[in-house]
Amino acid sequence: MFDFDDLSQAIARQTVLCVGDLMLDEFVYGEVSRISPEAPAPVIAVQRSETNIGGAGNVARNIAALGARGIFVGLVGQDAAGDQLEAELAKVDGIESVLVRDPSRPTTRKVRFVSEHFSTHMLRADWERAAPASEDIEQKLIAAILPLIARADIVLLSDYAKGVLTARVLRNVIDATRRAGKRVIVDPKSANLAIYRGASVLTPNRKEFSEATRSRAETEQEIAAAAQDAIYLADCEAILVTQSERGMTLVPRQGDPIHVPAYPVKVRDVSGAGDTVVAVLAAALAAGAAWEDALRMASAAAAVAVSKQGTASVTSAELRRKILPHAYRAAEEKIIENDGELATRVAVWRSEGLRVGFTNGCFDILHPGHVKVLTAARAACDRLVVGLNSDTSVKRLKGESRPVQDERARAEVLAALEAVDLVAIFTEETPLRLIELVRPSVLVKGGDYTREQVVGHEVVEAAGGEVLLIDILKGHSTTALVDRARSDQR
């Protein structure tokens, strides 16, 4: 049985050595509404731009996003783009990078001009020298890579045919990895699969597979038949053919092919989706996953990646939301573990134009009065964040005999309510820190308060928000329920 949480935790303990062609990906977003008077060419009115680590560097980003450790070796020029990539890689937690500088070539850089409204790529400009590295650079790459194999659980080679993975580099790395008793995953570019001989798994896309096998294989059976000669030629354990909306088919040397369908998803941008697939596959296999489980996780990751703009990485939390049934994960996913996750979730809602509300309390024993406040609060906004007093905070406020239920139990009860979208536990006596972080459009409080008495009202009103006071429901209180229960026991 596929246990996502166990596999995800195992992935976080792995180290993946990633070697390949590093690129600087730039995206220029705008709209086209006219043709240039100077030439029959569209004019893009630029609205924004962004820069990402691309190519094999995006593979490393995805490895780190899963919680695993990535060691990355790549090649850049002696230029500003190379400096920028080195700086960007240094910012990513979980990636240790070793970059070899080649003054004879520019750092590979790709600039894409994209229609913001339609997410359509209109033009791409490339700066590159797609030639094999010189013997001197090859030796520097090999010298950098080989000592790192001992520190890795698996080796991943991402070939974009930009010069890093020459025949000599491939041979040295694959042979050394096999001698160490470890797997090598290769995302190939060359149609000559023999140069990857000895790799454990090759992951060509449909076009690359057709060129390598000189076939027009479409069905699972045709792919399996065409792959057999390729497996023999490359002396590999298996070939995984990725097929975009058709899913992916794994053909092992021994055993039956395995086909995993693609998740239905609205595609925004396919840039870097293959990087995501191979990163997840390598990390899952390093963690000891069965083929089916690794493929299921990789397919889900691809679906998440193509639903994002630009060169995207995919986190373990995003995978969890994609893979696990909604009823299983809905409640527990509402419970926020840290401020960073809370800020990210709220930022996503705001980017979607949603109105965020906030309320707080101990919620020790949930009663109709609580439900009234929470329901009214949710009616006043699009997404409701509930600040929940921690156990230590409740003790300070209510006494040593409280809470009756620990903070996790109270959080799970709140998270199960349809009115609640997120639960954030705070240890302080007041939720001011959370309010400053969330900056809600509406701050809701139940009880006999004036607006000025509500903690955080200054923060909310200064940002243009409002404070909403809800009348309490008479005859319902946790303290009364606790006292009644204790008197009944006497």
UniProtKB/Swiss-Prot annotation:
Keyword Phosphoprotein recorded: no
Region (Cytidylyltransferase): 358-490
Listed transmembrane segments: none
Pathway noted in the entry: Nucleotide-sugar biosynthesis; ADP-L-glycero-beta-D-manno-heptose biosynthesis; ADP-L-glycero-beta-D-manno-heptose from D-glycero-beta-D-manno-heptose 7-phosphate: step 1/4; Nucleotide-sugar biosynthesis; ADP-L-glycero-beta-D-manno-heptose biosynthesis; ADP-L-glycero-beta-D-manno-heptose from D-glycero-beta-D-manno-heptose 7-phosphate: step 3/4
Domain of life: Bacteria
Known catalytic reactions: D-glycero-beta-D-manno-heptose 7-phosphate + ATP = D-glycero-beta-D-manno-heptose 1,7-bisphosphate + ADP + H(+); D-glycero-beta-D-manno-heptose 1-phosphate + ATP + H(+) = ADP-D-glycero-beta-D-manno-heptose + diphosphate
Matching HAMAP family: HldE
Positions of region (Ribokinase): 1-330
Gene Ontology BP terms: ADP-L-glycero-beta-D-manno-heptose biosynthetic process
The family this protein is said to belong to: In the N-terminal section; belongs to the carbohydrate kinase PfkB family. In the C-terminal section; belongs to the cytidylyltransferase family.
EC id: 2.7.1.167, 2.7.7.70
Entry protein name: Bifunctional protein HldE
InterPro entries noted in UniProt: Bifunc_HldE, Carboh/pur_kinase_PfkB_CS, Cyt_trans-like, PfkB_dom, RfaE_dom_I, RfaE_dom_II, Ribokinase-like, Rossmann-like_a/b/a_fold
Subunit structure: Homodimer.
PANTHER family membership: BIFUNCTIONAL PROTEIN HLDE
Keyword Kinase appears in the UniProt entry: yes
GO cellular component, one term: cytosol
Example GO molecular function: heptose-1-phosphate adenylyltransferase activity
